[in-house]
Curated annotation (Swiss-Prot):
Keywords: ATP-binding, Cell inner membrane, Cell membrane, Lipid transport, Membrane, Nucleotide-binding, Translocase, Transmembrane, Transmembrane helix, Transport. Homodimer. ATP binds at G374, R375, S376, G377, S378, G379, K380, S381. PROSITE patterns: ABC_TM1F, ABC_TRANSPORTER_1, ABC_TRANSPORTER_2, MSBA. This is ATP-dependent lipid A-core flippase. It is found in: Cell inner membrane. It is a multi-pass membrane protein. One of its GO terms (cellular component) is plasma membrane. It catalyses: ATP + H2O + lipid A-core oligosaccharideSide 1 = ADP + phosphate + lipid A-core oligosaccharideSide 2. Residues 26-308 form the ABC transmembrane type-1 domain. The gene is msbA. Involved in lipopolysaccharide (LPS) biosynthesis. Translocates lipid A-core from the inner to the outer leaflet of the inner membrane. Transmembrane domains (TMD) form a pore in the inner membrane and the ATP-binding domain (NBD) is responsible for energy generation. Its EC number is 7.5.2.6. Residues 340-576 form the ABC transporter domain.
Length: 582
């Protein structure tokens, strides 16, 4: 019952997408009904042609028929074109709207959602699932209305000719309904598996493409091929189950219909029935019954399209029903001063996980620089995730200029931070547009060039034919790691936010580039609050305070010299790095 209720809810919700285009949708339905009515009208004239035209040898009937046929087929063809156009126009409008809605909603979902779902699966929702909704639903409506109207017309014609024989034929109704009910459940289950399988195909392909260099360097081609083959075969198997179910159900329904047709022929052979039916009437009745098998087959098959569309829509709506980021804040400031306080902050990524941060307390005064150091997994990057509210704290509070960061509107809060991560994201656009990406106001070419010069981007773009107008390729594939990172730093320079978060910002730079960038960052940090997450201790020696982290806790704090004098964890890290580089 829950499954049926969910299906009805999904169907009603899907109809809501059609509502804005109901005029075109109604026009499509009327054209389809008209198409089926013409087919029924054409069949109804068989009796006249046989009884009056041939049996009575009335040549006028045959001549009128010769004029009637071309006209009726021109009208029939016009209605077919119109119905197909209007229906697919509505279908593409629906999928465009749904795809845009899904894309926009995914951007509003919290970072935690994206961390728990594979990129390939989410891409498959936007590309494959939405397309399935449009294609399957359009085909389902086309067949359902057109063939349904044709079935209604044929049944009316059959009852007009002989209601007794028509009743015998209708015995198949309950049996067909039973078969369709069983098949519907099967279609829905298999279609849902196909959505999941296609998501896995996309994910596996995406991982191989993104990690192509790693795959070939570690001779992982065979393993990746085997993994993809297994997933690909699962998709094939599920599709074959769908095809087999459709073929078997069609054959069963047609067999049931053939038994009913046999009964009609037996009853029609009785003397009293032979006396009632003319040759034309019986031919019309028999033709209508035979013609009824085709739309019955189509209507059985349309169930698979309908169930596939419902399964895809359910998958899409599941994402659309995911709650977006909580933004209850109302405080808006043009530019924050930059005072930051972590007050007894504890946080876990998952409820049952060990805390990523535990009882964290520290303060960063306006214009000061605090560095976070420690081994991987100690909680350094988690602090930047909490500051920008990619995640919300479970215990304690984070203050910005004396106000809880939850009190700020999200857009306003994130506008106060310029984040440069070790994982640089570039878009398939020009270098200049990547630097200017997300700028809160229109920026001049001069400002872009200035930021590029400060981040030493022009050092490599000056040798390029198109300079800053050079396309970077997908995620900056045409550039080196150091070049990508310099573009990200130029983006932060242009953003001119009061607070900087540098998460291993110089990790991909060579020694010469790092020296240039350190000079640029030194200029950038003036009169700005900066939180620097660093692995290379040489980059944070001048920080106002250094926090040493381990297992989500701050175990040491002080200036570079103070921490060296303590001869604790920082002292050991320092010796390890500099003895290794000596």
């Amino acid at each position: 019952m829950d499954s049926q209720l969910k299906k009805k809810t999904t169907f009603k919700r899907l109809l809501g997408y059609i509502k804005p285009y109901k005029a075109a949708f109604i026009a499509a339905i009327l054209c389809m009904i008209g198409y089926s009515a013409i087919d029924t009208l054409f069949l109804s004239q068989i009796e006249t042609l046989i009884d009056d035209g041939l049996t009575e040898q009335d040549s006028n009937i045959l001549l009128y028929g010769a004029l009637f046929v071309p006209f009726i087929f021109i009208l029939r063809g016009s209605l077919n074109v119109a119905s197909s156009y209007f229906l697919h126009w509505v279908g593409f409008k629906v999928v465009t709207k749904m795809r845009q809605q899904l894309f926009d909603h995914m951007m509003k979902l919290p970072v935690g959602f994206h961390d728990q779902h594979s990129t390939g699966d989410l891409i498959s929702k936007i590309t494959y699932d939405t397309q399935q909704v449009a294609e399957a639903s359009s085909r389902a409506v086309l067949v359902l209305v057109k063939e349904g109207a044709f079935v209604a017309g044929l049944l009316g014609l059959m009852f007009y000719q002989s209601w007794q024989l028509s009743l015998v034929f209708l015995v198949i109704g309950p049996l067909v309904a039973k078969v369709v009910g069983v098949v519907s459940r099967r279609f829905r289950k298999v279609s849902s598996r196909i959505q999941t399988a296609m998501g896995n195909v996309t994910t596996t392909a995406e991982q191989m493409i993104n990690g192509h260099k790693v795959v070939i360097m570690h001779q992982g081609q065979k393993g990746e091929s085997t993994r993809f083959s297994e997933i690909n075969n699962i998709t094939r198997n599920q599709n074959m189950k769908l095809v087999n179910t459709r073929a078997i159900s069609t054959s069963v329904i047609q067999f049931i219909a053939s038994l009913s047709l046999s009964m009609v022929l037996v009853i029609a052979s009785f003397p009293e029935m032979l006396g009632e039916l003319s040759a034309g009437a019986f031919t019309t009745l028999l033709t209508a019954m035979i013609m009824l098998l085709r739309p019955l087959k189509q209507l059985t098959n349309v169930n698979s399209d309908f169930q596939r569309g419902i399964a895809a829509a359910t998958s899409v709506f599941a994402i659309l029903d995911e709650p977006i980021e909580v933004d209850k804040g109302s405080r808006v400031v043009d530019r924050a001063a930059g005072d930051i306080v972590f007050d007894d902050v504890t946080f876990s990524y998952q409820k049952d996980d060990e805390p990523a941060l535990e009882h964290i307390n520290f303060k960063v005064d306006q214009g000061k620089t605090v560095a976070l150091v420690g081994r991987s997994g100690s909680g350094k990057s988690t602090i930047s995730n909490l500051l920008t509210r990619f995640y919300d704290v479970e215990q304690g509070s984070i203050l910005l200029d004396g106000h809880n960061i939850n009190d700020y509107k999200l857009k306003c809060l994130r506008r106060q931070f310029a984040l440069v991560s070790q994982h640089v994201t570039l878009f398939n656009d020009t270098i200049a547009n990547n630097i200017a990406y997300g700028a809160s106001k229109d920026v001049s070419r001069e400002n872009i060039i200035k930021a590029a010069e400060q981040a030493y981007v022009t050092e490599f773009t000056d040798s390029m034919p198109k300079g800053l107008d050079t396309m970077v390729g997908e995620n900056g594939v045409m550039l080196s790691g150091g070049q990508r990172q310099r573009i990200a730093i130029a983006r932060a320079l242009l953003q001119d936010a009061p607070i900087l978060i540098l998460d291993e910002a110089t990790s991909a730079l060579d020694t010469e580039s790092e020296r240039h960038i350190q000079d640029a960052l030194g200029t950038l940090r003036k009169n700005r609050t900066a939180i620097v997450i660093a692995h290379r201790l040489s980059t944070i020696e001048n920080a106002d305070e250094i926090l040493v982290m381990d297992n989500g806790e701050i175990i040491e704090r002080g200036t570079h010299q103070q921490l060296l004098d303590q001869e604790g964890a920082y002292f050991q890290l320092h010796n390890l790095q500099f003895s290794g580089s000596a």
